[in-house]
C-alpha cells in the first residue's frame, strides 16, 4: 500500500522540515569545540532567572494536566496590554497559532495571501490544507501592501503579514498597517505575525492591539520563543476579538501548552528588566553588524528584528559551510528564493565579534 496515494492532496507536495543538527553533533563531526549558533533567532542570554524559578516551583505539579485555558497566563497578558482574557488564545508557539487560524477559517481552494520572502510556515500551512497559495511579489524585500489589496478576491480567506518580516527584517509602520486594514474587506482575516515586535525600537513599535477596536477581522500572533527566551518550551498567544477567540478554542487542542511553559511565560512577562536587557543587546549588536557591512561595502537589508539578512554576492552555501568550519552557524536562505543571502542572528557581543572575524576571513575582506 502506497499511503501517499490516500493522503490529503496538499500533503503530497510537502516535505518534512529539515532541522539543523545539534551543536554537540556538529562539534563531533567537525572536530572543533565552542561552536556558536547565530542561525535561529534565539535569545542569546538563555533562560531568564524569573522563568527558571517558576519552572522549579511547578515541578511537583507535573503529574497533573496543565491548565488548558491558561488562566494565570491570560490574566497576565491581559493586564500587561490592556486586553480581556476572552480575546487571548493559547498556542504551542506562534507556529501553532498560524496553523490554527488556517484550520479554523480556510477551506480547500480558498485563497491565502502572503508575501514573497515571508516566513516559510505561511505557504506550508496553506499547502497542508489544500488551499490556494497566492504569493504577492515583494517590494524592496518587504510586503507590498498595494499588491495585497489588488490580489484580494471573493475567494480570499486569509492574509498572513509579518511585522517585522522574517527573514528579511523589513518593517511596516503603524500608519501603513492601519491604512491597509481600512481597505481589507471584512470577509478576509488578516493575521499579523509579530514574533519579533519586542526588538523594534519603542518609538517605532506598532501598538497593534489598539487596531482590534476598529478591525474585528484582525488576529495578532505573538511568541515567547524570541525576546523572552522560551523557544524550547513552545508557547505563544493570539489576540483577536472574543468572537474569533471562541472559534479558535473550538479547534485548538486542549492542553496544547504544558505546565512548565505556562509557568515560565507568566513569570517572564513580568520581567521587564530582562526584556530591556535583551532589546539593548540586540540594538547594539545589530548596529555593530550593519556598520561593519557598510564599511566593507557589503549589501544588507536594514533590519528591525534580532537578525540581519546579508547579500554575499555569490552563492551563499559555500560561505555558510566555510563559516561552519570556523565554528559559526548562520542560516543560508536559498529556500526562500534568496540563494546569495545569509541570515545572521544577533548574539552576545563576543559572538557577534567572532562572526565578523570569521566572515572577514572567509570573504577575504
From Swiss-Prot:
Position of the signal peptide: none
S-S bridge residues: none
CDD domains for this protein: AAT_like
Keywords for the protein's UniProt record, in alphabetical order: Amino-acid biosynthesis, Aminotransferase, Histidine biosynthesis, Pyridoxal phosphate, Transferase
Pathway: Amino-acid biosynthesis; L-histidine biosynthesis; L-histidine from 5-phospho-alpha-D-ribose 1-diphosphate: step 7/9
Modified residues (N6-(pyridoxal phosphate)lysine): 226
Reactions mediated catalytically: L-histidinol phosphate + 2-oxoglutarate = 3-(imidazol-4-yl)-2-oxopropyl phosphate + L-glutamate
Record-level Gene Ontology MF annotations: histidinol-phosphate transaminase activity; pyridoxal phosphate binding
GO biological process: L-histidine biosynthetic process
Domain of life (superkingdom): Bacteria
UniProt keyword Transferase, yes or no: yes
Cofactor requirements of the protein: pyridoxal 5'-phosphate
Top enzyme class: transferase
InterPro entries for the chain: Aminotrans_II_pyridoxalP_BS, Aminotransferase_I/II_large, HisP_aminotrans, HistidinolP_aminotransfase, PyrdxlP-dep_Trfase, PyrdxlP-dep_Trfase_major, PyrdxlP-dep_Trfase_small
The protein's Enzyme Commission number: 2.6.1.9
SUPFAM superfamilies: PLP-dependent transferases
Family according to the record: Belongs to the class-II pyridoxal-phosphate-dependent aminotransferase family. Histidinol-phosphate aminotransferase subfamily.
PANTHER family noted in UniProt: HISTIDINOL-PHOSPHATE AMINOTRANSFERASE, HISTIDINOL-PHOSPHATE AMINOTRANSFERASE 2
Subunit description: Homodimer.
Protein name, entry field: Histidinol-phosphate aminotransferase 2
Species of origin: Pasteurella multocida (strain Pm70)
Amino acid at each position: 500500500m502506497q499511503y501517499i496515494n490516500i493522503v490529503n492532496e496538499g500533503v503530497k507536495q510537502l516535505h518534512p522540515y529539515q532541522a539543523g543538527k545539534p551543536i554537540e553533533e556538529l562539534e563531533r563531526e567537525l572536530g572543533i569545540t565552542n561552536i556558536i549558533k547565530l542561525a535561529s533567532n534565539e535569545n542569546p542570554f538563555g533562560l531568564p532567572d524569573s522563568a527558571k524559578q517558576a519552572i522549579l516551583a511547578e515541578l511537583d505539579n507535573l503529574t497533573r494536566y496543565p491548565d488548558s485555558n491558561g488562566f494565570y497566563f491570560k490574566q497576565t497578558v491581559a493586564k500587561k496590554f490592556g486586553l480581556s482574557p476572552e480575546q487571548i488564545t493559547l498556542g504551542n508557539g506562534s507556529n501553532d497559532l498560524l496553523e490554527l487560524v488556517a484550520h479554523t477559517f480556510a477551506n480547500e481552494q480558498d485563497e491565502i495571501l502572503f508575501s514573497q520572502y515571508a516566513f516559510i510556515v505561511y505557504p506550508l500551512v496553506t499547502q497542508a490544507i489544500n488551499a490556494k497559495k497566492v504569493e504577492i511579489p515583494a517590494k524592496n524585500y518587504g510586503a507590498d501592501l498595494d499588491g495585497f489589496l489588488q490580489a484580494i478576491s471573493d475567494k480570499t480567506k486569509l492574509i498572513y503579514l509579518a511585522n517585522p518580516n522574517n527573514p528579511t527584517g523589513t518593517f511596516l509602520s503603524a500608519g501603513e498597517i492601519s491604512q491597509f486594514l481600512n481597505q481589507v474587506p471584512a470577509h478576509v482575516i488578516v493575521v499579523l505575525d509579530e514574533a519579533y515586535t519586542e526588538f523594534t525600537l519603542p518609538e517605532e513599535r506598532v501598538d497593534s492591539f489598539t487596531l482590534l477596536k476598529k478591525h474585528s477581522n484582525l488576529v495578532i500572533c505573538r511568541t515567547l520563543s524570541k525576546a523572552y527566551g522560551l523557544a524550547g518550551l513552545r508557547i505563544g498567544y493570539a489576540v483577536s476579538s472574543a468572537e474569533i477567540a471562541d472559534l479558535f478554542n473550538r479547534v485548538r487542542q486542549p492542553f496544547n501548552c504544558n505546565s512548565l511553559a505556562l509557568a515560565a511565560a507568566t513569570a517572564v512577562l513580568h520581567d521587564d528588566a530582562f526584556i530591556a536587557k535583551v532589546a539593548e543587546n540586540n540594538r547594539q549588536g545589530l548596529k555593530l553588524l550593519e556598520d561593519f557591512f557598510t564599511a566593507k561595502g557589503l549589501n544588507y537589508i536594514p533590519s528591525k528584528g534580532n537578525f540581519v539578512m546579508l547579500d554575499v554576492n555569490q552563492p551563499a552555501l559555500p560561505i555558510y559551510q566555510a563559516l561552519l568550519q570556523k565554528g559559526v552557524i548562520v542560516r543560508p536562505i536559498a529556500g526562500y528564493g534568496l540563494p546569495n543571502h545569509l541570515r545572521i542572528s544577533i548574539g552576545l557581543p563576543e559572538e557577534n565579534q567572532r562572526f565578523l572575524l570569521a566572515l572577514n576571513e572567509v570573504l577575504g575582506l
